[in-house]
Amino acid sequence: MRQKYYIEAAARGLVGSCPGQARYLLWAYSSTHEDNSTFQETCPHCFQLLVLDNSRVRLKPKAKLTPKIQKLLNREARNDTLSFKEAKLLRKYKDSTSVLLITCRTCNRTVRHHGKSRSFLWALKSNAATAANKASPKTPKRTAPGSANLGQSTNGSKGKSPSLTIRTPTSGQSTPICSSRNGSKRKKHFSQLKALLSQSASDKNPKLDFRHFLSSL
């Protein structure tokens, strides 16, 4: 590979002073190596360096989009059946490529360089779009805390009676009324238990009976 670049650089240096020697260097290297070792911007027939003075460049564009082709594309998008002639015409439109024509003025021969077809470009574009969608991170959906608590309560209460559902206060909310009621009940039960233990066996109060105390809990 380094020898190829060296010979090409030497040929470009000799093209002004000795064009025949430059062509001979390019021909000698191409004849002793593989077919794919041709030089860029060089005529493959006479090994003349193609510059603006000794070459002519033309561009043959792809087949244009006609109304008939547009109708066939619309039918194909709707998954309609196409005849053999219509399918062949549509395939010819998709496989059409732009052609770069370079004519060497020394040997009067034309070299064709084909571009990429429409089907290849469409596939490349679709693959790039899918790769971009896979690479983009998916942001999780944010839900409000009230809606989340509501969803949890509804899911937990399915198949249960309303009496079995337990409501827990959310964080940040206090229940002073419930706490005061629980404290008064505890004091009352403690006083009843103290009176029940301190009374003698002779004078028993029916209101301070042990069964009555347990039933009041």
UniProtKB/Swiss-Prot annotation:
Pfam families: DUF4674. InterPro entries: DUF4674. Keywords: Phosphoprotein. The keyword Signal does not apply. The modification Phosphoserine is found at S126. Residues 149-182 have a biased composition (Polar residues). Signal peptide: none annotated. The modification Phosphothreonine is found at T130, T139. This is UPF0711 protein C18orf21 homolog.
